[in-house]
Swiss-Prot record:
It is found in: Nucleus. One of its GO terms (molecular function) is RNA polymerase II transcription regulatory region sequence-specific DNA binding. The keyword tRNA processing does not apply. Keywords: DNA-binding, Homeobox, Nucleus. This is Homeobox protein SMOX-3. The keyword DNA-binding applies. Residues 4-63 bind DNA.
Length: 288
């Protein structure tokens, strides 16, 4: 059998306008949307479905053409000035943020017709040239600022940042390193620092002696007997005399004084806690 030749459908401008408007809303309309659209533009649902298939294929083709341009566009976080883009009511639903991730985004292109895309491309090209000009001007300004800060300026000028003494000092420091072709890691070029490990150890020893007192002071870490209240009182009296002497002594660290007072308070609390009626009763019996 001979195949029946398919008649090519021709669309009017009104039909194409309605179809494009529906395509901007969604690329994949459901059966109800297609039937409603077919009734409005006097077409069959099958013709509308075929048109959407062809339109999606055309959109993918244009997307592949535009895709390489995204790699060449410089990334910029500066938003696009809306005054540079020609006002168009169909562009109101497009969110323009930056050329690297929004203008060539397929989701945003779905809501823009082909004619509007050409206008967008022209606007983006103009924006890219403006962006390059701005970066060039900022680089020139930075270079000028660096030149003003460099120490090779004449020190006689009123805008000189470094004085003669500072330049002389820097030359004296850098001079030995320029003369030697090879830097040797020895004491000749790297003299021992003020805070060497040995000096740090010595400092730590002196600090240790300044914090920890001599053996003449009472060691409160040794626990006293619970029932020996006389020894506790003697220790308290001795500690009070010791604290008065330590206040006069400037070598005692303040933190050590604080720990001593805390220990005294702890011993007082421990002595008071153990001085229960039962302990006093046993003490009276032992005294008799």
């Amino acid at each position: 059998k001979r195949k029946q030749r398919r008649i090519r459908t021709t669309f009017t401008s009104l039909q194409l306008k309605e179809l494009e408007r529906a395509f901007q809303e969604t690329h994949y309309p459901d059966i109800y949307t297609r039937e409603d659209l077919a009734l409005r533009i006097d077409l069959t649902e099958a013709r509308v479905q075929v048109w959407f298939q062809n339109r999606r294929a055309k959109f993918r083709k244009t997307e592949r053409v535009i895709q390489p341009d995204t790699t060449t566009t410089p990334s910029s976080s500066i938003p696009i000035n809306m005054n540079n883009i020609e006002h168009n009511p169909s562009l109101t639903n497009v969110q323009l943020t930056s050329p690297d991730n929004s203008i060539y985004n397929p989701k945003l292109l779905s809501s823009v017709s082909l004619d509007d895309q050409d206008k967008l491309h022209k606007a983006i090209d103009a924006y890219n040239t403006m962006d390059k000009y701005e970066t060039n001007t900022t680089n020139d300004l930075l270079n000028r600022m660096k030149e003003t800060d460099l120490p090779h300026q004449s020190s006689t000028s009123p805008l000189s940042y470094h004085s003669k003494d500072e330049l002389k000092y820097s030359k004296e420091i850098i001079g030995p390193f320029k003369k030697t072709g090879q830097m040797k890691f020895s004491n000749e070029f790297y003299p021992p620092l003020k805070d060497s490990p040995f000096s740090v150890m010595q400092k730590s020893d002196t600090l240790h002696h300044s914090i920890i007192p001599s053996k003449s002071y009472i060691d409160w870490s040794n626990p006293c007997r619970q029932g020996d209240n006389d020894s506790i009182n003697n220790n308290i009296m001795n500690s009070t005399t010791i604290t008065t002497t330590t206040n006069n002594n400037s070598n005692i660290h303040p933190l050590y004084k604080l720990t001593q007072t805390c220990r005294q308070v702890n011993r007082l609390l421990v002595g008071g806690a153990h001085d229960t009626p039962l302990n006093t009763f046993h003490k009276k019996i032992s005294d008799k």
